[in-house]
Amino acid sequence: MNKGNGKFNFWQKWLTYANLMTIAVGLLVAFAGNSFFFEIHNNYTKDVFLNGNEFDQNILELKNWLFGIIGGTIVGFHILMVMISENSFKKKEKWAYKTMWYGLLTWFIIDSGISIYYGAIHNVIIINLVALVLIGIPLIMTKNEFKN
């Protein structure tokens, strides 16, 4: 294995593990959205949408339902990312590289844009930027492998 392949392999594995970690976060979103894992996010959400008041029972049920389907979507999206990373991306197929960027950036722009529109900047900072950096770094670091 030459040095270039070692570098590529490192970043490809980072990409896989970052997405596996995000799958775990998606499961937490779906099944533990009111736990200490999301206390900061939930507190900021209350500040933005409820003037700092607690969720009443109806709002809490709506939030739990939304977190459930959002968590499921996160899990499904990142399972696809892992499968692409471990197969076509690893084989340096250009479509895989482009697809990962398209999926990541489409999610980031839509999710962050809506969050900003509604004043939920905390979602962009706490969740979206972390995921963008965590998954974007290995994509940036491997771009030269997909030039042909």
List each language-model region with its residue ranges:
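Short, Lys/Arg-rich, polar N-terminal cytosolic tail immediately upstream
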Residues: 1-7
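N-terminal signal-anchor transmembrane alpha helix
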Residues: 12-38
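Membrane-embedded alpha-helical transmembrane segments of multi-pass integral membrane proteins
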Residues: 18-28, 73-83, 103-110, 130-137
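A loop-to-helix transmembrane entry motif
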Residues: 37-42, 57-75
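Luminal/periplasmic active-site loops of membrane-embedded glycosylation enzymes
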Residues: 45-58
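Cytoplasmic juxtamembrane regions at transmembrane-helix boundaries
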Residues: 81-103
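Membrane-helix boundary connector in multi-pass membrane proteins
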Residues: 108-127
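Membrane-water interface at the C-terminal end of transmembrane alpha helices
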Residues: 132-148
